[in-house]
């Protein structure tokens, strides 16, 4: 096959680790965008500064004047009222405004760009109207599934997902046939850049360009380079939207280089991004005590589903094996598993066939499994933002949840201090008598 197959970038867990502060992005099509006209939203409308934009707080999705097919799908999916980020974003986004949005995990950011792009998509055979990029295969797969749910009553719209780990020939076959060529493409930067470079994918008809978990993609030099190359292959005039739960002051100017006078939305102050229904604790212990303490927690806690984060693929494999030997219904998801097997395991977990998932940070961002109400940091992440994304897997969409972090060395203690400082919270030690299940389980 082409050179694309040989040097296809597949971002591993190690490559997804936090890097140094990035250098400014190189000039892309459209040039460097100015800040004039930027609109900022605070989660507290009363605290919004003079001149800031206060969103249209709708009582229902119908006020957004969406297509009837979309309104039917929203109702069919069981949604009644938009979240705060949806109330603020969607009315402006469907008008073609560039959007830079930070909102806490679990508040419906994905639905913002899915609904907006389905509202705007142009169905032309053999042409791609919408391009969505994210940093992991699992997240791409999940976003594709969200598109399929919301376009249930739009049968003419074709959705495609492209990522590494599967033969590129399958992607080429889909793209070459006008009957199967997707109008909306979701994918990872490495595979998409390979397809663009070898001219299998042409992006000259793209009207909307979306980055989900944008800080992660623009914070890594290799991934940012891929994003820039793909961006240059799209028309200068297009809508650009970027979303994440964490947008540092350093990464925001880089994001805005891709945009023209974006609507900037920061739901809640950036220092207060933890979820309201999420109870958070830490446990001090020795490294050798982790397995025993984990077993005790899994026995005593009343969880629906739990995700356990570790720092490497080897530890994920070994811990999963240990849990299964102890008769816990566990599955491991990390970059050391083939793509086909990863998707199978992800579906097993999401479909509630498995209640325990051991994962690396490849599963730490954007993955949405509604039944997770317990997140355990078996190994703490290296920084505060990664901590937020991890614990955000529990207690999504305002539901209750519990997060417990093991602290076994000085480095862990420093991370804990960084979390408390960054998000202005005081994380208590896990109580000797445990936690009342009513604090982290849904009550009817």
From Swiss-Prot:
UniProt subcellular location: Nucleus
Origin: domain of life: Eukaryota
Gene Ontology molecular functions: ATP binding; ATP hydrolysis activity; mRNA binding; RNA helicase activity
Keyword Transport: yes
EC number, UniProt record: 3.6.4.13
Domain Helicase C-terminal span(s) in chain numbering: 277-438
Binding site for ATP: 103-110
Q motif, short sequence motif: residues: 59-87
Any one annotated GO CC term: spliceosomal complex
InterPro entries: DEAD/DEAH_box_helicase_dom, Helicase_ATP-bd, Helicase_C-like, P-loop_NTPase, RNA_helicase_DEAD_Q_motif
Main enzyme class: hydrolase
TM ranges: none
Gene3D superfamilies according to UniProt: P-loop containing nucleotide triphosphate hydrolases
Domain Helicase ATP-binding: 90-265
Record motif DECD box, residues: 212-215
GO terms for biological process, alphabetical: mRNA 3'-end processing; mRNA export from nucleus; mRNA splicing, via spliceosome; subtelomeric heterochromatin formation; transcription elongation by RNA polymerase II; transcription-coupled nucleotide-excision repair
SUPFAM superfamilies per record: P-loop containing nucleoside triphosphate hydrolases
UniProt similarity note: Belongs to the DEAD box helicase family. DECD subfamily.
Known function: ATP-binding RNA helicase involved in transcription elongation and required for the export of mRNA out of the nucleus. SUB2 also plays a role in pre-mRNA splicing and spliceosome assembly. May be involved in rDNA and telomeric silencing, and maintenance of genome integrity.
Domain comment, as recorded: The Q motif is unique to and characteristic of the DEAD box family of RNA helicases and controls ATP binding and hydrolysis.
Protein name: ATP-dependent RNA helicase sub2
Originating species: Sclerotinia sclerotiorum (strain ATCC 18683 / 1980 / Ss-1)
Lineage: Eukaryota, Fungi, Dikarya, Ascomycota, Pezizomycotina
């Amino acid at each position: 096959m082409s050179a694309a197959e040989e040097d296809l970038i597949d971002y591993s867990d190690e490559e997804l680790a936090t890097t140094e502060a990035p250098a400014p992005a190189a000039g892309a099509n459209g040039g460097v965008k100015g800040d004039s006209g930027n609109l900022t939203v605070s989660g507290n409308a009363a605290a919004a500064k003079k001149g800031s934009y206060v969103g249209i707080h709708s009582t229902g999705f119908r006020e957004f004047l969406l297509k009837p097919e979309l309104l039917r799908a929203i109702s069919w999916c069981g949604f009644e009222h938009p979240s705060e980020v949806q109330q603020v974003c969607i009315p402006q986004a469907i008008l073609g405004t560039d959007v830079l949005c930070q909102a806490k995990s679990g508040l419906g950011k994905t639905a913002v760009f899915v609904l907006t792009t389905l509202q705007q998509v142009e169905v032309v055979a053999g042409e791609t109207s919408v391009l969505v990029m994210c940093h992991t295969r699992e997240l791409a797969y999940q976003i594709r599934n969200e598109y399929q749910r919301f376009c249930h009553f739009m049968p003419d719209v074709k959705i495609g997902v492209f990522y590494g780990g599967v033969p590129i020939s399958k992607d080429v076959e889909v793209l070459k046939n006008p009957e199967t060529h997707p109008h909306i493409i979701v994918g990872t930067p490495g595979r998409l850049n390979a397809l663009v470079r070898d001219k299998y994918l042409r992006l000259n008809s793209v009207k909307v360009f979306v980055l989900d978990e944008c800080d992660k993609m623009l914070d890594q030099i290799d991934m940012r380079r891929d994003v820039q190359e793909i961006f240059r292959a799209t028309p200068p005039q297009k809508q650009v939207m970027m979303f994440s739960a964490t947008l540092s002051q350093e990464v925001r100017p880089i994001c805005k280089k891709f945009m023209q006078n974006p609507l900037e939305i920061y739901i809640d102050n950036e220092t207060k991004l933890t979820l309201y229904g999420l109870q958070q604790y830490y446990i001090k212990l020795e490294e050798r005590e982790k397995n025993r303490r984990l077993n005790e927690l899994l026995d005593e806690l009343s969880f629906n589903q739990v995700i356990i984060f570790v720092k490497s693929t080897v530890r994920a494999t070994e811990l999963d094996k240990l849990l299964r030997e102890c008769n816990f219904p566990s599955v491991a998801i990390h970059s050391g598993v083939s793509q086909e097997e990863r998707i199978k395991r992800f579906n097993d977990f999401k479909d509630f066939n498995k209640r325990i998932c051991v994962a690396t940070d490849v599963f730490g961002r954007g993955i949405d499994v509604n039944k997770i109400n317990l997140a355990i940091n078996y190994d703490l992440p290296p920084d505060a933002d990664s901590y937020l994304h991890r614990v955000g897997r529990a207690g999504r969409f305002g539901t209750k949840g519990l997060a417990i972090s093991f602290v076994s060395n000085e480095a862990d203690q420093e991370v804990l201090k960084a979390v408390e400082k960054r998000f202005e919270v005081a994380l208590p030690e896990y109580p000797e008598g445990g936690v009342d299940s009513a604090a982290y389980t849904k009550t009817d």
